[in-house]
Structure formats: structure tokens, C-alpha cells
From Swiss-Prot:
This is A-type ATP synthase subunit A. Component of the A-type ATP synthase that produces ATP from ADP in the presence of a proton gradient across the membrane. The A chain is the catalytic subunit. Coiled coil: none annotated. It catalyses: ATP + H2O + 4 H(+)(in) = ADP + phosphate + 5 H(+)(out).
């Protein structure tokens, strides 16, 4: 192994000499305490190292030892329900081992417990041919998720021996004989370099929407399975609650939640809340299918980059089993700030607003690892990783580099608006600024699962909301009574859309999740009201009378009505009442 000594220290960046033979992105142990670091630059025999722990107290002359391996994630049973820091050190295990409320420097605890035993049930037999990605057995990791044990990358051949029973993650469970007669032992744990995307057979088109149960996100700005989305918004606009809602209700099997440089108390909220939340899909706890990566703002900045790559590697591992994974990163801006700080320490040429010139390529490397794929292996498995990245632009300025570079990469943009949040309109996603480029891809799915006219109704409702925004400027100057009758109807129906459809109560048992069919029926009902109201106005009805009809109260009750009762009883009754009351005005 390469061994050198420290010549310079600048915050999280350390320079060591005598490092000839070291490799880029190799993990090294820095100083007498053996702090974890990663080589990010090599020049002759000097190595520039970013250190993932606090460097205070280290002095020039202390040793630097190479490990010969890149920064890698340990992947295997025991990750679900776990809480890691940015470099996949298990926080609960560190607390148990050190009895400290802080992470001591240089502490080394395996990411996955070597003592815990897991019940392994084989799904292949001796003599079966296997290749990388094939599932050879299962482990019931939690009540919600069955962990599938796969053949590691680079191994293929014939099963010579396979066991059944309780094993630790490092005990051999099978032996594979390769084509050249070599015998390879298979254990339940794999290691994978976090900067390298895991392989797959092919990427599949994003044709199926990720149903989140949130009306605004699903109906107007849908995210496809395997897609990437950004949630930019200023402080207090509801980024974290929006991400919690997605984690709770999305039709993904597994959630990886990365708290990247966020406040400690926000991460504490997640850690306290998630273990108590019930997962209505499985009936178990939400934590049973969640991996938490807590990397708060007071932890060393270099670890923010590692936390993002560690999170996406864990997500890809579960994707390779054929699961759907939702990865939420809160917030990518803090990672970009860490890049800016380290770039400054390296004395690199700054780009826009001091961020490094490679900001956009690093963001792209991360977001491009999302996707719906045909997984490796003989069996026809499909899995997906969806990325939802929160962005925290200073002062809510969407033109700043992190937001603008993110928007070039992702196809869904949910713009949070502080003004909507102040008016208590939640989710505070601004429907005039947001967009989704997946609409054409997921349109067929919506038509098959709701109705043929889904797209027309959705587009018509969107046009009304845009017209309302144009009319609001006139209304503020001269009042609504000066508008033509049809435009007064547009204002009234747009208000119904905003209050009775777009607003959603995250704390209501009924309204917290809204199925695609209920979403379509609610929107169709409001648009039926609009078309009947326009006809009534053309026949001479007064818009003031239309605004007073009692059926509007029934429309307001739609979201708080259980789905079955709404679809079978309330919706047909409302449509009938709309015709009756509006016809009576003519």
C-alpha cells in the first residue's frame, strides 16, 4: 500500500507527498487518528485529499496510508431501517460502540453488521447456470421488503453448492464454478464504488407515471417512473413536507432519503417521524422500506458529495433486484456549496457565483443515474430509480447557477412559491412556473386508467388557471364587476380549481392521498361546472347568481369524501345537481 506524509492542510483539504502509485478517488487514512479521506487530485508524488472528517489538530508530518480501494458502499441485508452518515457509517452502531452523542474522529464501524444473522432461502439449485444480476435466494429483511441476494458483477458460471439457513453477511452461502474451473464463494454482501453507476441491460422509456397521490403533481406535472424532478423553493415554502408526502405515498417500493447538508433539527424530525408513520400500502411502518442518510450542515462539507453518491448507489442496488426506488435529496444546493468550498481550497478558477466550472457535469452525473431499466440477469426483471432533488436557491432566485443547471437536466420542475405558502395554499407549488416534459409519455397510461378525455380536461383546466392569472391584473385595477360575464365565470371556476382541487390537506386521513381515478373525476366535475356555467351565461344568466349556487358546497366536500363513496354516489349526484341548478338560472 502507498504511504506518504502530510505537507499542507487547508480545512477539509490535505496535501500529502510520497504518494507515488496512488490512484484517483482512492480512499486513504489521514493522520495518526486514521481519518477517512479520498484522493481528488494527483501531481507527481503529491496527492490532494478531501477529508470526510474534521481535520482540526492534524499537523504536517503525520502519515497518510492508502487503502488501494475507491470509496465504496456495502450493499446487503441490514440497510433498510438503518441510519447512515455521508460515508455510510451506521449512526446507531457508532452510538452503541462509543457511547458518544457525536461521531468520534477516526471511528471505524462496518456499514452492515457482521454479527447479525439472516434467514437465507435459496431460489436456485445445484447445477443451475447463473450470471451477474441473477437472484439466487431471498432474505426477509423487514415485514415489507424481501431482500433478494444477487450474483455480484463479473461472476458467471454454474452453481456448485448452495446452502439454506441463518448466516451473517460475510459467511459463504453458495459456490459458483466459472467456465475456466475457478470456484468463487458468494456471500450476501457486495461492495460497489459509489462513483460508478451500476450496470443494467437497457434503459426503458419512461411511460408509466409515478403516482404520488398528490393532485397537483400527478394531474398537472406528472413524474414518470425512472424520471428526475427538482423542487426548488425559498425557506419555509414546504420543500421538506412535500418530500415527506412523496416518501409516504409514492408507488415506489423503497425510499432512500438523503439529508444532504440540511439543518440538524430537520433531520431529527425525519428520524423521529418516519419510524412512527404507517405505510398504508403494506400496513407496516414506513421505516421498514426506508434508508436514511443523515449528513447535517455541521458535519464536514466533503461528506456531502459522498452522501449523494452513496444514496444513489444504494438506490441502484435495490433497483437491480427489480424494485422501484424513490430517492429524495434534501438539498442538492448544500452539496453544490460544498463543491464551491473545496474548489476554492484547491484554488481552481471559479465559475458563475463562485461555483466550480464542473458544477453542471457533476449534477448531470447524479441525475442521469435515475431511470427505468431492464436489470442484469437471466430473469426479466425491471426496476426504476426516481430522483427528487430539493434545491434551496438563496432568496428564492431561480436564476442562480444550481437551479438553472438542474433545470437543464431534469424533466419535471415543481416550483415552490413563498407567496402561496404565506397564503396557506399547500402544496405551495406554483402552477404557472412548474412544468413536466413527461406529459406526452405518460398520457396513454392515464387514458387507460382513467378516461380517454383525460388530456383534454387537464389542458383545459391549465388554460383556465393561466387565464385567471392574466385577469387578476385587471381585477386589481378595476374590480371583477367590470369584466365581461364569461371572464367572471373563469375567475369563479379558477377559484374552485385552486381551492377544491389544487389545495391538498397532508394532515387529513382522506385527503392526504388521492387516487388517479378520484383525481380525474374531481377535475371532470369542476370542468363540467365550467361548461354548464358558460352555457348558462350565453343564455342570459347572471355570473353573480352562478357564484351563489349551492352545488359549489358539494364540490368543496369532494376531497374529504372517501373514494368509493365519492365515485359511486357523490360525483354523479353533483353532476346532476350542476345541470339542475344552472338550468334553473336561465
Amino acid at each position: 500500500m502507498v504511504s506518504g506524509k502530510i505537507v499542507k492542510i487547508a480545512g477539509p483539504v490535505v496535501v500529502a507527498e510520497g504518494m507515488k502509485g496512488a490512484q484517483m478517488y482512492e480512499v486513504v487514512k489521514v493522520g495518526n487518528e486514521g481519518l477517512t479521506g479520498e484522493i481528488i487530485q494527483l501531481e507527481s508524488d503529491k496527492a490532494v485529499i478531501q477529508v470526510y472528517e474534521e481535520t482540526a489538530g492534524i499537523v504536517p508530518g503525520e502519515p497518510v496510508e492508502g487503502t488501494g480501494a475507491p470509496l465504496s458502499a456495502e450493499l446487503g441485508p441490514g440497510m433498510l431501517k438503518a441510519m447512515y452518515d455521508g460515508i455510510q457509517r451506521p449512526l446507531t452502531a457508532i452510538e452503541d460502540a462509543t457511547k458518544s452523542i457525536y461521531i468520534p474522529r477516526g471511528v471505524s464501524v462496518p456499514s452492515i453488521s457482521r454479527e447479525a444473522k439472516w434467514d437465507f432461502t435459496p431460489t436456485v439449485n445445484v447445477g443451475d447456470k447463473v450470471e451477474a444480476g441473477d437472484i439466487i435466494g431471498t432474505v426477509p429483511e423487514t415485514k415489507s421488503i424481501v431482500h433478494k441476494i444477487m450474483i455480484p458483477n463479473g461472476i458467471s458460471g454454474t452453481i456448485k453448492e448452495i446452502k439454506s439457513g441463518s448466516f451473517t453477511v460475510v459467511e459463504p452461502i453458495a459456490i459458483v464454478e466459472t467456465e475456466n474451473g475457478e470456484e468463487k464463494e458468494i456471500i450476501m454482501m457486495q461492495k460497489w464504488p459509489v462513483r460508478n453507476p451500476r450496470p443494467y441491460k437497457e434503459k426503458l422509456p419512461p411511460e408509466i407515471p409515478l403516482v404520488t397521490g398528490q393532485r397537483l403533481e400527478d394531474t398537472f406535472f406528472g413524474l414518470a417512473k425512472g424520471g428526475a424532478s427538482a423542487i426548488p423553493g425559498p425557506f419555509g415554502s414546504g420543500k421538506t413536507v412535500t418530500q415527506h408526502q412523496l416518501a409516504k405515498w409514492s408507488d415506489a417500493d423503497i425510499v432512500v432519503y438523503i439529508g444532504c447538508g440540511e439543518r440538524g433539527n430537520e433531520m431529527t424530525e425525519v428520524i423521529e417521524e418516519f419510524p412512527h408513520l404507517d405505510d398504508l400500502k403494506t400496513g407496516n411502518k414506513l421505516m421498514d422500506r426506508t434508508v436514511l442518510i443523515a449528513n447535517t450542515s455541521n458535519m464536514p462539507v466533503a461528506a456531502r458529495e459522498a452522501s449523494v453518491y452513496t444514496g444513489i448507489t444504494i438506490a441502484e442496488y435495490f433497483r437491480d433486484m427489480g424494485y422501484g426506488v424513490l430517492l429524495t435529496a434534501d438539498s442538492t444546493s448544500r452539496w453544490a456549496e460544498a463543491m464551491r468550498e473545496i474548489s476554492g481550497r484547491l484554488e481552481e478558477m471559479p465559475g458563475e457565483e463562485g461555483y466550480p466550472a464542473y458544477l453542471s457535469s457533476r449534477l448531470a452525473q447524479f441525475y442521469e443515474r435515475a431511470g427505468r431499466v431492464a436489470c442484469m440477469g437471466h430473469d426479466e426483471k425491471q426496476g426504476f430509480v426516481c430522483i427528487v432533488g430539493a434545491v434551496s436557491p438563496p432568496g428564492g432566485d431561480f436564476s442562480e447557477p444550481v437551479t438553472s443547471n438542474t433545470l437543464r437536466i431534469v424533466k419535471v420542475f415543481w416550483a415552490l412559491d413563498a407567496n402561496l405558502a404565506r397564503r396557506r395554499h399547500f402544496p405551495a407549488i406554483n402552477w404557472l412556473q412548474s412544468y413536466s416534459l413527461y406529459l406526452d409519455d405518460i398520457e396513454d397510461w392515464w387514458k387507460e386508467n382513467t378516461a380517454e378525455d383525460w388530456r383534454e380536461i387537464r389542458d383545459e383546466a391549465m388554460n383556465l388557471l393561466q387565464k385567471e392569472a392574466e385577469l387578476q391584473e385587471i381585477v386589481q385595477l378595476v374590480g371583477p364587476d367590470a369584466l365581461p360575464d364569461k371572464e367572471r365565470v373563469i375567475l369563479e371556476v379558477s377559484r374552485m380549481l385552486r381551492e377544491d382541487f389544487l389545495q391538498q390537506d397532508a394532515f387529513s386521513d382522506i385527503d392526504s392521498y388521492c387516487s388517479p381515478m378520484k383525481q380525474y373525476t374531481m377535475l371532470k366535475t369542476i370542468m363540467t361546472f365550467y361548461s354548464k356555467a358558460i352555457l348558462a351565461v350565453e343564455k342570459g344568466a347572471d355570473p353573480a347568481d352562478i357564484a351563489k349556487v349551492s352545488v359549489k358546497q358539494d364540490v368543496a366536500k369532494m376531497k374529504y369524501t372517501p373514494e368509493e363513496e365519492f365515485l359511486n354516489k357523490l360525483a354523479p349526484a353533483i353532476v346532476e345537481k350542476i345541470s339542475k341548478e344552472l338550468d334553473a338560472l336561465v
